[in-house]
Amino acid sequence: TLSSSSAASDVYKRQVDSVEDKPYTRRPAAPFTTSTLQQEAARKLRMSSRVSMQVAQRLYENGYITYMRTDSVNLSQEAVQAARRQATELYGADAVPAQPRVYAKRNETAQEAHEAIRPAGDSFRTPAQVKAELRPDEFRLYELIWKRTVASQMADAKGYTATLRLSATAQDGRLAQFSASGTVITFKGFLDAYEEGRDAEVDGENAEAKDRRLPQVAQGERLTGDPIEATGHETSPPARYTEASIVAELERREIGRPSTYAPTISTIMDRGYVSKRGTALVPSWTAFAVIGLLEDYFAKYVDYDFTARMEDDLDLSLIHISE
């Protein structure tokens, strides 16, 4: 390591001291549920939860996609075959695994009354085939759904995770040592079609480093690069929620249903409890006052587990009625 920025700027003669490789495999993401569609539309398309559901509603009503309020990641057999067939046609036979992929429930309370969100029909229309028929926002959301569905039936991406150890000699003769870790992809698989987004502010630098792509280098290889600059780092507080991350948190805590995620976010924004600063959701002073009041006088009803317990009680009631 370097102790000062002046020493850093003097470094030259960089070379690779060692390369440690470990096998890397990455599976495609499951087809869309309501919550994951809202999260991806927020990250990739900058659509709010309300807008993404309005656009999805139009696509569904006009016969372009299946029902958009669902907590299931399962596809019908016809949809699985359509996705595999289209992946083979577009990306080659190697892009599809020998057996169809089956995805497990995201959580135990998933009702799975409908299949996952996907292009409609037993033979998918490509984005290029429907572009002239759709409005720009409809086309972008359809393309996102189509890519995710096709990719969900494609082969794993494969490669290796490399840890590089580098050394360099400064002009004053001191030895500087560095290390870098990242992923080298040797077979793209589903990445040819689609790569799942992430909320960078929430996942942080560790997740970014895990999937950082490195060039292929060999031990002893001489390297060139930009001038080295030493920078300081400080611990940051937890990031504010975005629409994507708050939907994920609602689902994780089993608060609400797929049909209530977008209305819940819309309600707290319409009432002035939160506002948007960039993509972040920032609470107002009114929100703090309301939360304090509710916690003091209605603690039972604002407990995070209340909804899950109520759902369980309703399920038990239905069982007793059926008996």
Model-derived regions, located:
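Single conserved hydrophobic/aromatic residue that forms the stacking wall/gate
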Residues: T1-A8, Y12, I319-E323
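N-terminal alpha-helical segment
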Residues: S4, T33-T34, M310
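Short Gly/charged-rich anion-binding patches and loops
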Residues: A7, T36, Q54, S245, ...
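Basic, low-complexity terminal or inter-domain segments flanking catalytic cores
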Residues: Q15-V16, E20, S48-R50, M68-S322
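C-terminal accessory/connector segments of nucleic-acid motor ATPases
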Residues: V19-V55, T242
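Short alpha-helical scaffolding segments that buttress acidic/His motifs in well-ordered protein cores
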Residues: V55-A56, I145
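Eukaryotic nuclear/nucleolar intrinsically disordered, charge-dense low-complexity regions
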Residues: N62-I65
